Regions:
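N-proximal low-complexity "stem/linker" segments adjacent to membrane-targeting elements
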Residues: 1-48
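C-terminal catalytic/acceptor-binding lobe
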Residues: 3-5, 219-284
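Short acidic, S/G/P-rich loop/turn micro-motifs used as interaction or catalytic elements
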Residues: 40-44, 70, 140-142, 202-205
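Short, acidic, metal-binding catalytic loop of nucleotide-sugar glycosyltransferases
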Residues: 51-60
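Active-site-proximal specificity loops/subdomain of glycosyltransferases
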Residues: 67-129
């Protein structure tokens, strides 16, 4: 299939412009581990998020990273491991479409991407390589068992699209030009995977491709201003493994769905009832 994107074309066997790309048949996710990528100072929200997750998946393991924030070691037990690491998020907040090519910002982006891969590897190892993983944050509430379309290796709601602005479009043409140089990859034009729920072995395959082709993929940071945010970076890793993000109707977001409290969605993003005013990155 040839996809026409203005002055560019992309060849693939699916239409990446379509948001709802799933099948009707689903399977339950039972074997899953949780990786909290950055909990910073969201103490109450983190505790509530973990409590909710354990209510649904009591046997699942959790790898918890505090990137320069509070010490959560008091939460450790046989199913939860805590790691205090460097804050790689606050510097990214200051990067935008005007300054992302500055050498110092390039270094920040690359450092953040490397940290995400390291945390994924550490988390999967602690969780004993479950069939599925969930990379998440404290503003995510898992309030029910999650299922996946039979063909899916990565779940999300694909809410973001590359043609949102011309600069985004140009950036994703650059990203996909890099991906096209590597055998077995697919294009990426839609994404929005928060939390990231994916198939562990497929992720590891994508990481392997990324590391083997790092001379090419190190240039991702030069194409777009935020390629390292994990809702985009992980779909890129799955694209390297030949797998698209597949739309899940089990996701909802509090800021987009005023009826989220009474809806049946098991995965809730932007859940901030336990946040306080000093819970955010930046100068706090």
């Amino acid at each position: 299939m040839i996809i026409d994107l203005g002055n560019h074309t992309i060849e693939c066997d699916f239409d990446p412009r379509i948001q709802c790309n799933n099948s009707a048949e689903k399977l339950p996710i039972e074997d899953i581990g949780f990786i909290y990528n950055c909990v910073f100072k969201q103490r109450s929200a983190t505790i509530r998020s973990i409590e909710a997750t354990r209510e649904v998946y009591p046997e699942a393991k959790t790898y918890l990273v505090s990137d320069g924030g509070l010490d959560y070691s008091f939460l450790e037990d046989e199913r939860l491991k805590f790691s205090m690491q460097e804050d790689t998020v606050s510097p990214i907040i200051k990067i935008n479409e005007s300054n992302y090519l500055d050498p110092k910002n390039q270094a920040v982006t690359k450092k953040g991407m490397a940290a995400t891969i390291r945390r994924l590897k550490e988390g999967l190892e602690f969780c004993e390589y479950p069939e599925w993983f969930c990379m998440t944050e404290p503003d995510v509430l898992i309030r029910g068992k999650v299922s996946h379309p039979v063909e899916a290796k990565l779940l999300g709601h694909r809410i973001n699209f590359a043609w949102y602005t011309k600069s985004w479009y140009d950036g994703f043409i650059g990203i996909n030009n890099l991906l096209s140089q590597i055998e077995g990859t697919i294009p990426i034009l839609r994404w929005g995977s928060v939390p990231v729920i994916g198939h562990s072995q497929t992720l590891l395959k994508g990481i392997e491709v990324y590391e083997k082709n790092f001379d090419i993929l190190d240039k991702l940071s030069e194409q777009f201003h935020v390629p390292g945010t994990f809702d985009l970076f992980l779909p890129i890793l799955f694209a390297l493994a030949g797998e698209p993000e597949v739309f899940s109707d089990e996701y909802t977001e509090c800021l987009r769905n005023p009826n989220w409290k009474t809806s049946s969605h098991p995965v809730v993003h932007q859940y901030r009832e336990f946040y306080s005013n000093n819970d955010y990155y930046g100068d706090n």
